[in-house]
Amino acid sequence: MPIRHCIVHLIDKKPDGSPAVLHARDSELAASDAIENLLADLNDSYNAKQGKAWGFFHGESGAYPLSGWLKQYLEGEKDFTAFSRVAVEHLQKLMEESNLSTGGHILFAHYQQGMTEYLAIALLHHSEGVAVNAELDVTPSRHLDLGQLHLAARINLSEWKNNQNSKQYISFIKGKNGKKVSDYFRDFIGCQEGVDGPGETRTLLKAFSDFVESEDLPEESAREKTQTLVEYATTQTKLGEPVTLEELSSLIDEDRPKAFYDHIRNKDYGLSPEIPADKRTLNQFRRFTGRAEGLSISFEAHLLGDKVEYDEAAGTLIIKGLPTTLVDQLKRRKD
C-alpha cells in the first residue's frame, strides 16, 4: 500500500464546551514501517466498522470548504501539509461549536491501493495500558486504540476525479448517538449521503430471492448460490470495496454469468452497478433470528425447509436434529 503523504495533528478538547486547542505539525511524517502498520491497521478497522454511510461532496461553499482545498492540493496549488493545516483548523472551529465533541489526533493520509488513490481522515484516541520493559518491570503504556474508531472518512480520489456522476465516492462512519456527536464531522468532510447501504443491500437480497424463486432451483443449488452471494459481499465489505453486480452474477452462475445481472436489469430494481454492501444486513440474511419471552431462536437460512420447517398457518416451527447438549438438558429435566 504505497503511502503518498501522511501527517497527524492534535486537537485538545474536552466535551464540556471548553475551547479546542490546536497543536499542528509543521511537516509530513517520514515514511516508516510504523506508519505503514498504522495505515494497514486503520484500514482493517475501518473496513470492519458497521453502520458506515456513502455519499458525495456538497457543492463547494463557505460551509463546506474541504472539497475546494482538496482540489487545490491535487492540482498542485497547495502541498499536503498546507492542505491538512487549513482542513484541521476548520475542524477545530466545528469542534468548538459542538459542545459534546472530544478532541484527539487527526490523521490525514493520501495512499494508494492497487490503481485507486484514497484520502483517509480519522480522529484517533489513545488507550491506557501496561507493558513489560527490558528490565522486566511492568510500566504504564499508551497506544492508539483503533478498535474505538468512531469518526473517520475515506474519499476515493480516483472515483471523484474520473466519475462526475458518482454518489458514493465518500464513505464515513455514521455516529450512533445522533446529530450532537457526529454530524459536525460529516459537515467537516462536506458530505451528503447519496447511497443507502442497508437499503441497497436489502434490495439486492430481495432481487436474489426473487431470482432463486423464478429459476425454481433445487434446494442444494439455492443454498450454494446464497452462500456464494454472502461470502462475496462479506469479502468486499472487509476490503472496503463495493459489490459489483456483474462480478457477483458471474460468481452465482458460472455457466450463465449474465443471468442474475439480466434479472436485476429486466425487473428494474433500481440498483446501481456497484453498491456498498451493509455487513449487518448481510448477517441477517445469513441467519434467521428471533426472540420472545424466555425464548431465543437462531438458525442458518439454508436449514429452512430441511432441518427447520415453518408452518405459517399454525405459526409453528418444527426443528429436527436437535443439538445433543439441548437433548441432554431436556432428558434431565424429564427425569
UniProtKB/Swiss-Prot annotation:
Gene Ontology MF terms in the entry: double-stranded DNA binding; single-stranded RNA binding
Pfam name, any one: NA37
Keywords, ordered alphabetically: Cytoplasm
Localization of this protein: Cytoplasm, Nucleoid
Cysteine disulfide links: none
UniProt key word Isomerase: no
GO-annotated cellular components: bacterial nucleoid; cytoplasm
InterPro entries: Nucleoid_associated_NdpA
Main location: cytoplasm
NCBIfam families the record matches: PRK00378.1
UniProt record similarity statement: Belongs to the YejK family.
Protein name, UniProt field: Nucleoid-associated protein Pput_1012
Organism the protein comes from: Pseudomonas putida (strain ATCC 700007 / DSM 6899 / JCM 31910 / BCRC 17059 / LMG 24140 / F1)
Lineage of source species: Bacteria, Pseudomonadati, Pseudomonadota, Gammaproteobacteria, Pseudomonadales
